[in-house]
Amino acid sequence: MSTTYLQAVNDVLTRLREQTVTTVALTDYSQLIGKFVNDAKRQVENAFNWNALRQTISINTVAGTSNYTLTGAGQNFRVEDVFNTTSCVTMANLDGNTMYRYLNFGTLPQSSPTHYAFSGVSGGNAKVDIWPVPDGVYALKFNLFVPTADLSSDSYTLTVAEPVIIQLAYARGLVERGEDGGLSSSEAYALGRAMLSDFIAMEGTNFIENQLFVAV
């Protein structure tokens, strides 16, 4: 069963030899530890393309429209693949300057989209330009790794590498409090980094793409 936000905070408090709480918002200190848990969560989620963070954002194009919002993607995602499933095409990523020239210089061709480039933000979500401008309805699939939102409710759960997040939050707690004769903050951080490496290695064995080495 996944670890809740409250359980993670209490785990860190216990390691710091502090009193556990019934809600993260109970004391100023438990709220601070909650901040550290969220900081550690972001660090861990950004460290690897975790399977639990995979999402597919779907777009159905409109004829003559080249710009779309990836609702639910946020801004800190990582792209795995983008497909035009209607035309059975893997879409290629263009740099922003090239896409701007394609969309603004000369007569715009309208056909099945084959290229994309990210362009701006709307409502906290990334926007994307596609080219050629669609001449009808095409189903586009953006396969992304999307970090989870910050934990705020006691019942929210951690998604990836829970022991690592707790260990790194504990290390942050040690830095804030100062040394007290127990594990030093540098030792706690080193242990957290080693744990993170182990979790990444274990996750990587489940996916063949993480075991390929390509000469460059």
Regions found by a protein language model. Give the residues of each.
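Glycine-enriched, solvent-exposed interface loops adjoining structured elements
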Residues: 1-216
